[in-house]
């Protein structure tokens, strides 16, 4: 007699923010998903398909209505996700956890104030940008610089800015984002050893004082349609260098985010959409 193993069931919600897509799990009464399960969920052919997995947790701070943890498509953990924060905010509103127009969420990188602007638009205070190499962390460079240079080992030299938005970012200014070598250079910077354990690599073009185009090669996921923390990182770098105003639109392949940074000591504010796609049940032996 052949015994068929009955798979466990895992309810989930599929969401996206400007095309950056997520599998959202309610983990308030459950364990962390294993790296294997995260990879299975993220698989676009054999799973649900997503850039990252978001796990809803009970709040960790007194003023938060919920907390969330983040896993990339390769099963590794992440400390920050701007688009994910907006989606968790929308999830919290729908679940009845957040009842007013302003509330807070806890992420692995800290506590974030959220403003509900309409049914599917949220503003999140992401973080105060940190530029000191040791706070990113960036290795092999002594002292803080506006731009760093690195030899990527294949004859390619790049100039980049570096910043932490709760997670590490390298920002490279380019003439044309459409033709920028996002995958090749993004992977090379990630493998360079300059950032440990790794880094998100953004390729930015300034169109005007209030408009920036951006593509981002994320660690653990590759290029995504949008990266909220990457948009904040690019905007903060360009604002600090005087290239753009303190309130800009960042245009990504999947949509547009509004980024503002009132002053150097303030959190960067990110405004953008959060969308529910569908709800379902995932069947997997390792759940």
Curated annotation (Swiss-Prot):
Q: Where is this site: Could be important to modulate the pK values of the two catalytic cysteine residues?
A: 169, 218
Task: Set out the biological process GO terms recorded for this chain's protein.
Answer: antibiotic biosynthetic process; lysine biosynthetic process via diaminopimelate
Kindly state which reaction or reactions the protein catalyses. Answer: O-ureido-L-serine = O-ureido-D-serine
- Indicate the residues that form the catalytic site: 81, 227
Q: Which Pfam families match?
A: DAP_epimerase (PF01678)
What's the protein name? O-ureido-serine racemase
Provide the Gene Ontology terms for cellular component: cytosol
Q: What does this protein do?
A: Involved in the biosynthesis of the antibiotic D-cycloserine (DCS), a cyclic structural analog of D-alanine, used as an antitubercular agent. Catalyzes the stereoinversion of O-ureido-L-serine to O-ureido-D-serine.
Stored InterPro entries: DAP_epimerase_DapF
Tagged with keyword Cytoplasm: yes
Q: What GO terms are given for molecular function?
A: diaminopimelate epimerase activity; racemase and epimerase activity, acting on amino acids and derivatives
Sorted alphabetically, the keyword list is: Antibiotic biosynthesis, Cytoplasm, Isomerase
**Known EC number(s)?**
5.1.1.19
Location, primary (coarse class): cytoplasm
NCBIfam families tied to this protein: DapF (TIGR00652)
Q: What else is known?
A: It employs a two-base mechanism, with a thiolate-thiol pair in the active site.
Which ranges form a coiled coil?
none
Location in the cell reads:
Cytoplasm
> Site Important for dimerization: which residues?
278
- What HAMAP family does this protein's entry cite? DAP_epimerase (MF_00197)
Similarity comment text for this entry? Belongs to the diaminopimelate epimerase family.
Residues reported to bind substrate: 20, 82-83, 167, 200, 218-219, 228-229
Q: Species name for this entry?
A: Streptomyces lavendulae
Q: How is its activity regulated?
A: Inhibited by thiol-inactivating reagents such as iodoacetamide and Hg(2+) ions.
State the oligomer form and interacting partners: Monomer.
- How does the record characterize pH dependence? Optimum pH is 7.9.
